[in-house]
Regions:
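Helix-loop-helix module between adjacent transmembrane segments
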Residues: 85-90, 124, 128-133
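Short helix-coil transition sites and intra-membrane helix breaks within transmembrane domains
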Residues: 56-57, 78, 92-95, 134
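Alpha-helical solenoid scaffolds in large eukaryotic transport, assembly, and signaling factors
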Residues: 1-71, 88-92
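Short inter-helical turns and helix N-cap capping residues of alpha-solenoid HEAT/ARM repeat scaffolds
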Residues: 2, 6, 37-38, 76-77, ...
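HEAT/HEAT-like alpha-solenoid repeats
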Residues: 23-33, 58-73, 96-111, 137-147
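A conserved hydrophobic secondary-structure block that centers on an alpha-helix together
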Residues: 112-125, 136-137
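Outer-membrane beta-barrel transmembrane domain signature of Gram-negative proteins
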Residues: 67, 78-79
């Protein structure tokens, strides 16, 4: 199946999920789209993951998402970094917050030309989303060491 077809079918899954139908399949295709280098596929995958996944989803999918998001948060491309942080802010699961907190804190506190203002704003919004959803995570030493 071509990447165009995968992207098209994932958009159909997103649409059916938004309409309220049970779409508990196709998450692995969305994760494979996140791994693509083409921006269209990556955007589609991140939107699908952000909308369709929650705490009750398959843990194996979260492991794949964490690895891909770690790569995107440290790649240096501001669009990919912003996509990853937007999705993290929307999902906000405790496991994702614990795993990716150091990278997000680093991005929010970095004040060099290597980290544009847009990326720092996304990082701060992601941290705010984590704070609103799980206040108990901010008591852990990982967060305190970052600040």
């Amino acid at each position: 199946m071509s990447t165009y077809d995968r992207r098209k079918y994932v958009w159909k899954l997103i649409y059916s999920h938004i309409l309220g139908y049970d779409a508990d399949f196709g998450h692995d295709v969305a994760v494979s789209l996140i791994n693509c280098f083409n921006l269209k596929e990556k955007v589609t995958g991140y939107i699908a993951i952000g909308i369709m996944l929650n705490e009750r989803s398959d843990p194996n999918i979260f492991v794949n998402c964490i690895e891909t998001m770690k790569q995107d948060l440290t790649c240096g491309n501001e669009v990919r970094e912003a996509l990853a942080m937007s999705t993290l802010g929307n999902m906000g699961t405790p496991s994702l917050a614990r795993e990716l907190a150091p990278a997000i804190i680093h991005k929010s506190l970095q004040q060099t030309k290597a980290c544009p203002l847009y990326v720092r704003k996304k990082a701060c919004m992601c941290l705010l989303s984590f704070l609103k959803r799980q206040k108990q995570i901010f008591d852990e030493p990982v967060w305190i060491e970052g600040f």
